[in-house]
């Protein structure tokens, strides 16, 4: 994974929206490991093709339209949120990190 040169190794992110319910809810704070290898099923912080930062679930590795490596990212709540069903495959360099745990309000590993 690339695209993390200007990021710290670890960081906090705040959840906005309901696209990842019931796993994450609005206002949750999560710990992100930037540059961590992505595996299918992992929660990731990604920059979607429209520039939006979002937490989504990495479903599977897929090629982008240009043939480069990427990920098919989905919302846990299929009724809400925008994901690869709407925006297509997200390039590897746009997958910024892996969400390791929720730190607030109820800490738990993800």
Question: Can you say where each PLM-predicted feature lies in the sequence?
Answer:
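Extended hydrophobic leader/signal-anchor segments used for secretion and membrane insertion
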Residues: 1-110
């Amino acid at each position: 994974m690339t695209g993390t040169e200007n990021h710290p190794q670890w960081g906090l992110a705040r959840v906005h929206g309901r696209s990842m319910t019931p796993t994450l809810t609005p206002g949750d704070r999560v710990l992100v490991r930037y540059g961590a290898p992505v595996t299918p099923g992992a929660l990731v912080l990604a920059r979607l093709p429209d520039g939006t930062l979002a937490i989504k679930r990495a479903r599977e590795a897929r090629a982008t339209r240009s043939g480069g490596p990427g990920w098919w990212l989905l919302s846990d709540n299929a009724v809400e949120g925008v994901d690869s069903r709407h925006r297509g495959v997200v390039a590897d360099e746009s997958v910024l990190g892996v969400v390791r745990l929720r730190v607030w309000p109820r800490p738990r590993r993800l």
